[in-house]
């Protein structure tokens, strides 16, 4: 018998708090955006939920995704679960921390200047980034 359920059926996923999830506040790590609640999912959320993934959390980030340390957010510094003395990296530090501490197996960050690569390296996480720009976002 062939399992025809979506490939990510029931897989919990967190999204960096710069990614819009309908009905959930998107703050971009700043108090300026408190109360900004999108009515539509971002394309990456649409694609993953169509495959059965379950959005369960928004991940903290460097304010406005601007920085590589993960230490500047209205919601506090992201602590590296592997070693609190080492920076969590940024800007997708919260996404990496959720994987590094074992809370989730799948999170979504964003990367323009190392924003996913740096926290993955700092926190010892496996990183996948699509080779195709059309698959991003």
State each model region's role.
Residues 57, 127-129:
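Structural signal for conserved beta-strand scaffold positions within catalytic alpha/beta enzyme cores
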Residues 73-76, 123-127:
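Short, hinge-like loop/turn segments at secondary-structure boundaries
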């Amino acid at each position: 018998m062939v399992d025809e359920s979506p490939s990510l059926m029931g897989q919990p996923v967190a999204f960096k708090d710069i990614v819009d999830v309908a009905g959930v506040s998107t703050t971009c790590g700043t108090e300026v955006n408190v109360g900004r609640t999108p009515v539509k999912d971002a394309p990456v959320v649409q694609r993953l939920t169509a495959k059965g993934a379950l959005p369960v959390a928004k991940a903290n980030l460097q304010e406005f995704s601007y920085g590589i340390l993960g230490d500047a957010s209205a919601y506090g510094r992201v602590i590296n679960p592997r070693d609190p003395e080492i920076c969590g990296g940024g800007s997708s530090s919260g996404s990496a921390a959720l994987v590094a501490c074992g809370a989730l197996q799948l999170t979504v960050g964003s990367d323009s200047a190392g924003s996913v690569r740096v926290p993955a390296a700092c926190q010892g996480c496996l990183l996948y980034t699509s080779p195709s720009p059309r698959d991003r976002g």
